Amino acid sequence: LPILASAVLCAGCQPASASVHYPGAIDACRLPGANLPAQLAAGTVEIPAASVKTADAKVVPEDQPGDGTEVTGCKRLFARDLGGGKANLQDYRLVTIAVVRFTDADSDQAATKASQLMTDALGDHSGVRLVTGVGDEAGFAEQWAAVRTGNVVLGVAIADGGTEAALIPAATLDNVQAAMTDMTSTLQRDFQG
């Protein structure tokens, strides 16, 4: 059975108003910092995302585009390092990032919808909680996290696959929180209106 844990990412840092707003499209691949591999995929070598056939990860509920939403995603694939940077393509970690942006012209309404997604789908009433889960079934494990800022819900899923994928160290809550904080900072710096 999955083991669930939660931690507060940034309690009190998100104002109740929609003062944070993202008016334009967001490139999810521009959000991760250079230290993402060290934070979320230690002991691996990054390889092209198409190198291994992997299952698609649903990062946050309702992460498909629809009326009033725009979704962008990014996949980063890491293979277990056999030593000296030699990748073992049999064991991998897939990091999938998704950005759900509510496009309502009324920024308060858009922020309310983003908050509602966090509340309804992720059980987070404040919109700033980091939720992670770990499961292991048939050689597959997954962790996930999500955070809301203004009219955007940012999510990440970390999925491991392969016969010896357990040899890739799992990302700790601190690692996941640091990666989410980095991505949120980039989002606010580069995409805020």
Residue ranges, per PLM feature:
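A small/polar (G/S/T-enriched), proline-flanked helix-loop surface module common
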Residues: S17-G193
